[in-house]
């Protein structure tokens, strides 16, 4: 029996619910958190190995309280899954400064706060795995996702830098970059769409809204399969540092790697000529 303890944020819907259920099925003790504890309980169901705690990731005090409660209940935390997030869509000029900051607050500073609360316990244990759900939007940017991609690019840089800092204490890190899965990401529950304000963007905004609404619920990725594979990977002695989840995510990685190499080669002679002479 697996007696490891997993704490996950944003467990009340979508991928968070699926991961929590898969972890329970694999024998984990699960601390499932969310802003609405009743919604989390209803989504996951009953289990003696489930402990539901209130946690708004934008409130560091909530993170500290949730971690304390988890340790009091189970005595340890072996896996942290930073999953909670949202999506402020729109062209950069039409996303308000407040909404842009709110996007970064939830998707970047949220995981930072929860991880900051968990790491002292993991250092004490001299073991642990910190997982943050990123996105292919953290690998490549595109139109209409500037705020979201900014938050995910920040996550990527932070997690890459965190890895060597905590490795001496037996703590591993893992980034997950899902492609398009049939979750609630494009629904009104998860996505905030701006009011069209600038005529130059109006037609493209309308086209994007229409395309995304048609895509919602039709994505090819099965979140239940993702959750099962995810739990299998985190249960390994050597979980991957970065996991491209989905065939489309793998294609995104390959395209980005090709583009970076091409850019490096295109200006190699100029870039290599910038050292002091002599």
Question: PLM features: residue spans?
Answer:
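The beta1-alpha1 cofactor-binding region of Rossmann-like NAD(H)/NADP(H)-dependent oxidoreductases
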Residues: 55-65, 97
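A glycine-rich helix->loop->beta "capping" turn
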Residues: 69-82, 88
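Active-site helix of classical SDR
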Residues: 115, 151
